[in-house]
C-alpha cells in the first residue's frame, strides 16, 4: 500500500485516545503493588471519564481501529476499553464492535482474546486464552482459571499470542490493577 492510498487518520480521535491512555496509566501508578483506597478511587474516576469520552466515539464510529485512529490510537482504544471494568455494558458493546472488526480483518484477534477473557473473568467464568491474572491482597499473582487447559496453546496460537509456558514473571505487566472476581484486583499478561 502506498502512502497516498492509506486512509486519513482522525487526529482528534487519536489525541483523545492517547490522552485517556496516558491518564489511565497515571491513575494506575500506585505506591504499592496493591492500590490503597484513594488510589482505587482515582482509578474509578478515570474509568468514568474514559467511558464518558470513549463511549460516544464507539457509538459514532464503531470499533476505533487502525484505519480510523492509526496503530497507536487502536492500541490506546483497546487498552482503555479493556480497563473500564466497572462499566460492563460499555465493555460488552465494545466487545461486539471488536468482534465485527476482527471478523472483517480490521483489528487484531489478540485484542479480542484479551477483552473476551476479561469479560469472562468478571463473570466468574474460566477464561479461554489465559490472558488474565488475579492480584491478591497479599501481592501474589495467579492466573485466572482457564477453560480446558489442554487447548490453551492452540487457542493462543490462533489469535497470535505466544505459548503460555513462555511467560516469565517479568512478562507480567501490572496494567489493569482493577477488580477481579469477588473484588480482587486483576492484572493482565502482555504477550
Question: Predicted regions span which residues?
Answer:
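An N-terminal structural lobe/cap that precedes and organizes the functional/catalytic core
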Residues: 1, 142, 146-149, 154, ...
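A surface-exposed partner-binding patch
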Residues: 65-74, 158, 162-170
Amino acid at each position: 500500500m502506498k502512502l497516498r492510498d492509506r486512509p486519513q487518520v482522525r487526529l482528534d480521535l487519536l489525541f483523545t485516545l492517547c490522552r485517556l491512555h496516558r491518564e489511565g496509566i497515571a491513575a494506575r501508578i500506585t505506591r504499592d503493588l496493591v492500590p490503597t483506597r484513594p488510589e482505587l478511587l482515582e482509578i474509578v474516576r478515570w474509568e468514568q471519564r474514559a467511558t464518558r469520552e470513549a463511549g460516544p466515539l464507539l457509538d459514532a464510529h464503531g470499533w476505533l481501529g487502525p484505519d480510523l485512529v492509526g496503530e497507536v490510537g487502536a492500541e490506546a482504544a483497546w487498552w482503555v476499553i479493556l480497563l473500564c471494568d466497572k462499566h460492563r455494558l460499555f465493555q460488552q458493546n465494545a466487545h461486539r464492535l471488536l468482534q465485527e472488526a476482527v471478523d472483517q480483518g480490521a483489528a487484531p484477534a489478540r485484542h479480542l482474546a484479551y477483552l473476551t477473557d476479561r469479560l469472562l473473568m468478571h463473570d466468574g467464568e474460566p477464561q479461554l486464552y489465559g490472558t488474565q491474572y488475579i492480584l491478591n491482597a497479599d501481592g501474589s499473582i495467579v492466573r485466572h482459571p482457564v477453560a480446558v487447559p489442554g487447548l490453551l496453546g492452540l487457542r493462543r496460537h490462533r489469535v497470535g499470542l505466544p505459548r503460555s509456558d513462555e511467560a516469565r514473571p517479568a512478562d507480567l505487566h501490572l496494567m489493569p490493577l482493577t477488580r477481579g472476581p469477588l473484588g480482587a484486583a486483576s492484572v493482565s499478561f502482555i504477550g
